[in-house]
C-alpha cells in the first residue's frame, strides 16, 4: 500500500495553485471537487437525492444541477448545507478511494487527495499526512472578494462556513505559506516533495 497525502486549505488561500504544482511534478492527485461533480451528474442517484430534498427548482433546464443556486442556498443555511454533505460526502469518498486504488495498482507509491473540507468532513483518517495551504485571513478575504466579485459580507459568509485557516494550519503536518509570490510557493511545494514524496 502506498502513501496518501491530504491537501487542503480554505476558500481562497490558493490550494488550486498548489494542486497544479503537484500535478506538474508528475504526482497523481485525486480532486474532491471533481469527484463531487461526478457523483451528482445527470442520471446519478446522488442528483436524484438532491432533487428529492431541495426540489426541482435546483435543476437547470437541461436537467443538470444548478450549482450557483444550490451554493447560495447552502451558504446561508447550515441545516441544508449539512443535508447536502450527508448526500454527497459518502459518494465522494467512495469515488476517491476507487481512484486511489487505481493509481496504486498502476504502481504509484504516493497519491495526493485534494480535499477542501478535509477537516470539516472528518476525513483525516483517509490520509497519512496533511498539507494546509495558508494565507492570512485578510489576504483570504481580499482574494475571495476579487475572484468571485463578492461584497465583504458575502465573502465573510463563505469563509465563516468553514473552519478557520489558522485552526487548519495547527492540525497540519506541513504548512505552505501562499501569502506572497508564486515563486515562493513553488519553492515550498518542491521542498515538500523532496522531503516527503521522493524520500519515501
UniProtKB/Swiss-Prot annotation:
Pathway: Cofactor biosynthesis; coenzyme A biosynthesis; CoA from (R)-pantothenate: step 5/5. It catalyses: 3'-dephospho-CoA + ATP = ADP + CoA + H(+). One of its GO terms (cellular component) is cytoplasm. The keyword NAD does not apply. Pfam families: CoaE (PF01121). PROSITE patterns: DPCK. GO terms for biological process: coenzyme A biosynthetic process. It is found in: Cytoplasm. It is an enzyme of class 2 (transferase). Gene3D superfamilies: P-loop containing nucleotide triphosphate hydrolases (3.40.50.300). Signal peptide: none annotated. Its EC number is 2.7.1.24. Keywords: ATP-binding, Coenzyme A biosynthesis, Cytoplasm, Kinase, Nucleotide-binding, Transferase. ATP binds at residues 12-17. GO terms for molecular function: ATP binding; dephospho-CoA kinase activity. Residues 4-200 form the DPCK domain. Belongs to the CoaE family. Catalyzes the phosphorylation of the 3'-hydroxyl group of dephosphocoenzyme A to form coenzyme A. This is Dephospho-CoA kinase. The lineage of its organism: Bacteria, Bacillati, Bacillota, Bacilli, Bacillales.
